[in-house]
């Protein structure tokens, strides 16, 4: 027991020491793995979709497979090599060009007479999506601003802005935008997504409509046996003829014409009234009252 005049000894706190050991104070932080810190909602969404452990991620993957199957089955000729050359003339004349191997689309804006060389281009993409082409040929005139590479990534759009045509090895700015689906019809006609609301094209209205074959209808309709022509010949029953007599108006009968004779259903202690006859009710008023007895 400490004396009243001396202070109590300070007890050693183990909780603070444990917290300092966990944090490490910068010395043991490398040995403690706290995991990856995710603060962006987009990273959380992409990670959940890639796990395939919940119902939403499975539906997302199935939807991607259905979209790819729909594009391939409904437009198989669009993604062939011959159709790419056919759609090339419908592209805008500012440097857009389609790829044949990877089914990509590159689009470049060239400055004064810049022409893409064979070694590199403004929108060239190889097997790796992060590969960027560099190096331009000698300055020319009338060349496209961007040229598609041989093995481009599917569903990519490359934007290139080369330097001047005199510079042999100029570095261009490459921006890659990944899209899941680009309609080849919108791409060929040059329709912007904002103009889809205003522009309505009915492709079925332009083609010649073939005459439909005249098949026999087997619907269950009330048709006589053999058709109407044979049934009219076999019909022997005829409706009998009869003369209609003159129409006579029926007399209007009114019951209880005198409304005063109608009974009243009010909740009053009034007896029923007869049909207009006077009725006298005899009520005995002088009823003898019996006196009280001794028992009461």
Swiss-Prot record:
The modification Phosphoserine is found at residue 82. GO terms for biological process: negative regulation of calcineurin-NFAT signaling cascade; negative regulation of skeletal muscle tissue regeneration; negative regulation of transcription by RNA polymerase II; sarcomere organization; skeletal muscle fiber adaptation; skeletal muscle tissue development; wound healing. One of its GO terms (molecular function) is protein serine/threonine phosphatase inhibitor activity. Residues 105-117, 134-170 have a biased composition (Gly residues). It comes from the Eukaryota. Pfam families: Calsarcin. One of its GO terms (cellular component) is actin cytoskeleton. Keywords: Cell projection, Nucleus, Phosphoprotein. It is found in: Nucleus; Cell projection, Pseudopodium. The keyword Nucleus applies. Residues 105-172 are annotated as: Disordered. InterPro entries: MYOZ. Expressed primarily in skeletal muscle and specifically enriched in the gastrocnemius, which is composed predominantly of fast-twitch muscle fibers. Detected at lower levels in heart. Myozenins may serve as intracellular binding proteins involved in linking Z-disk proteins such as alpha-actinin, gamma-filamin, TCAP/telethonin, LDB3/ZASP and localizing calcineurin signaling to the sarcomere. Plays an important role in the modulation of calcineurin signaling. May play a role in myofibrillogenesis. Interacts with ACTN2, ACTN3, FLNA, FLNB, FLNC, LDB3, PPP3CA and TCAP. Interacts via its C-terminal region with MYOT. Belongs to the myozenin family. This is Myozenin-1. It comes from Mus musculus (Mouse). The lineage of its organism: Eukaryota, Metazoa, Chordata, Craniata, Vertebrata.
């Amino acid at each position: 027991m400490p004396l009243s005049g001396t202070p109590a000894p300070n007890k050693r706190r183990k909780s603070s020491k444990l917290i300092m050991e966990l944090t490490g104070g910068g010395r043991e932080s490398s040995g403690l793995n706290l995991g990856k810190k995710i603060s962006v909602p987009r990273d959380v969404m992409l990670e959940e979709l890639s796990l395939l452990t919940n119902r939403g991620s499975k539906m997302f993957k199935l939807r991607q497979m259905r979209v790819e199957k729909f594009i391939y089955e409904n437009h198989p000729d669009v993604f062939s090599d011959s159709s790419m050359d056919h759609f090339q003339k419908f592209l805008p004349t500012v440097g857009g060009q389609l790829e044949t191997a990877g089914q990509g689309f590159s689009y470049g804006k060239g400055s004064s007479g810049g022409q893409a060389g064979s070694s590199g281009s403004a929108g060239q993409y190889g097997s790796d999506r992060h590969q960027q082409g560099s190096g331009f040929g000698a300055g020319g005139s009338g060349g496209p601003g961007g040229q598609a590479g041989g093995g481009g990534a599917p569903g990519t759009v490359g934007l290139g802005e080369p330097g001047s045509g005199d510079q042999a090895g100029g570095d261009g700015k490459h921006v890659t935008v990944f899209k899941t689906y680009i309609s080849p019809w919108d791409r060929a006609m040059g329709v912007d997504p904002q103009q889809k609301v205003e522009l309505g094209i009915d492709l079925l209205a332009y083609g010649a409509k073939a005459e439909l074959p005249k098949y026999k209808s087997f619907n269950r309709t009330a048709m006589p046996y053999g058709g109407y022509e044979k049934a009219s010949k076999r019909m022997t029953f005829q409706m009998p003829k009869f003369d209609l007599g003159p129409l006579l108006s029926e007399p209007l009968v009114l019951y209880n014409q005198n409304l005063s004779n109608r009974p009243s259903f009010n909740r009053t202690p009034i007896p029923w009234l007869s049909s207009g006859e006077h009725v006298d009710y005899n009520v005995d008023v002088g009823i003898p009252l019996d006196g009280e007895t001794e028992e009461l």
